[in-house]
Amino acid sequence: MGITTALLLVMLMSVHTSSYETTILKPYKEDNFRSLVAKACQFIDAHELCVSNIWTHVKESGHGLNPHSVLRAAVKEAHDKAKLAMERIPTVMMLSIRSREQVAIEDCKELVGFSVTELAWSMLEMNKLHGGGGIDLDDGSHDAAAAGGNLKTWLSAAMSNQDTCLEGFEGTERKYEELIKGSLRQVTQLVSNVLDMYTQLNALPFKASRNESVIASPEWLTETDESLMMRHDPSVMHPNTVVAIDGKGKYRTINEAINEAPNHSTKRYVIYVKKGVYKENIDLKKKKTNIMLVGDGIGQTIITGDRNFMQGLTTFRTATVAVSGRGFIAKDITFRNTAGPQNRQAVALRVDSDQSAFYRCSVEGYQDTLYAHSLRQFYRDCEIYGTIDFIFGNGAAVLQNCKIYTRVPLPLQKVTITAQGRKSPNQNTGFVIQNSYVLATQPTYLGRPWKLYSRTVYMNTYMSQLVQPRGWLEWFGNFALDTLWYGEYNNIGPGWRSSGRVKWPGYHIMDKRTALSFTVGSFIDGRRWLPATGVTFTAGLAN
């Protein structure tokens, strides 16, 4: 055990024996402080420059020599480096002449922009926690716990964006990938270091969730939002604007309505989309916050496209609908990609919207249907269709009371439902599928590990006959079998056979206590943010 790790463990023990203010914020001896700075900069190529910059940030902050000032300085350093990387990307774009490379580079600019935003949010949240507001991470208060969850969520997302950027160069000569990779490596490593330190310094003891079914609304959801979700007739919802393909609304296209919606709105903006088939690709940017799309029902209001990897696009860019503005809600809508299995990756819905909710929606495609890319997401009473890895990404996503349907793949292809992309054990990401139905029409596997720490759990879920006895599939060879976290609890149906499941070190047939840590109440602290929106959700384990 290295000196910096030992130091962090000592401080972690202190957190639980005395107040945060006296353990984490007290002045540290300069030698110990230097060890913390070194840990913040470990594995950074320009190590000495990183150390120097963090020292400068600490001095400028005026918060003294303590672990928190190092964390805040490291986040600022990551933010500054991400901004610098984003500014350099257009230069690389000017060098490329191939269309797929151009798309990949454009993706990188947007994704690094996501990281800049998420790191900025993280700095603001750290200021709330430790900037003199009197909030103590160890006092059990709502504000402290919620802010801590926000930090881990945003840092987890900021760590993943750079990977998605580089994945976009699949199918290219990758020479421009190398130019971009150098700028991104330092950002990713800095965020990884901060997550590691933050997790060790602020780990909280296990608290089991209560086993109950409640109607609850998160703090970020207003009473107006709740009442909107409970109304079954869109015509009485008093939407801000109406889209109708037949011309009987203010707009004929959804894109027109979104473009006219206010930017950075703190209030819910409701767009009612009347029944019809809308052939358009929608990209709801970060600035479009608190947008709500309401349709006339699954199969009635349909947004459809056919973008796909074989057209020279990245997976990220194939989405029929992409949402990244915070607080997005969709109700009674079908999201569809019709590219078919022969065209490989073809996303119907990509979600980078923090605190987003999807209620009574259908997401239909083949390979890579639902891209739960990042941040906190909730799906209730939804239907998901696909063939390969059709629920994938590195968001913190819960699917509850949903129906998952498999479709016919290409010959020799194997049907896999999930491919969760958790890269670090410190990321608070993963997929939880609870109280749902896996309705397999083909031999089907529950998931496979896309990244080293892939995490997916099925609980209280019905599995039909064609779910294979072994349950799960390798990505390749023994990759991630020791480090992934896959679990099942209290599943039923002919596709659930405990005796035949894989024997990987990372696979678990969970007992009740372990399962409780993956409930909405514990795994993602759902009582604070999951958008129940007036719809009953199970906070603990179902009966």
Swiss-Prot record:
PROSITE patterns: PECTINESTERASE_1, PECTINESTERASE_2. SUPFAM superfamilies: Pectin lyase-like, Plant invertase/pectin methylesterase inhibitor. Residues 38-197 are annotated as: Pectinesterase inhibitor 22. The active site is at D368 (proton donor), D389 (nucleophile). Its EC number is 3.1.1.11. Disulfide bonds join C382-C402. Pfam families: Pectinesterase, PMEI. Residues 240-527 are annotated as: Pectinesterase 22. The record marks Q367 as: Transition state stabilizer. The keyword Plastid does not apply. Keywords: Aspartyl esterase, Cell wall, Cell wall biogenesis/degradation, Disulfide bond, Glycoprotein, Hydrolase, Secreted, Signal. Transmembrane segments: none annotated. GO terms for molecular function: enzyme inhibitor activity; pectinesterase activity. Glycans are attached at N211, N263. Acts in the modification of cell walls via demethylesterification of cell wall pectin. The PMEI region may act as an autoinhibitory domain and prevent untimely PME activity during transport. PANTHER family: PECTINESTERASE. This is Putative pectinesterase/pectinesterase inhibitor 22. It comes from Arabidopsis thaliana (Mouse-ear cress). The gene is PME22.
